């Protein structure tokens, strides 16, 4: 899935709809990202907005005043990973903006290494442009 998103980004596209519902896992075990149906329209300057998936949509997707970028998909990938390792859907971005109450992955599942939990928290920061910069380190 991450390789597919990397190819999208290399092509200058942003998915904006990454969530468990858009990830298929066929019998051979190779995960596939779906939900591309309206990607061209969403990136072509149309008024069509991407569907928002609570817990997986980045904060900037809820605001017409903020821009989306690669960091939008990074947030969603981290949210999907958070769900994968904890079994819980992350708190939605609007709820977190009111009161940042999301527990770390490590606090929900002690087998998740602290450093990995910190990477997920970093990628899911509420301030979009700085959301993924620290995660490169």
Each model region followed by its residue ranges:
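Activation segment
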Residues: 38-39
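Activation loop
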Residues: 46-55
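Conserved protein kinase catalytic/activation segment
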Residues: 22-35
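Residue immediately N-terminal to the catalytic "proton-acceptor" Asp
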Residues: 16
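C-terminal lobe helix-coil module of Hanks-type protein kinase domains
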Residues: 55-137
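Protein kinase catalytic-loop region centered on the HRD/HxD motif
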Residues: 1-13
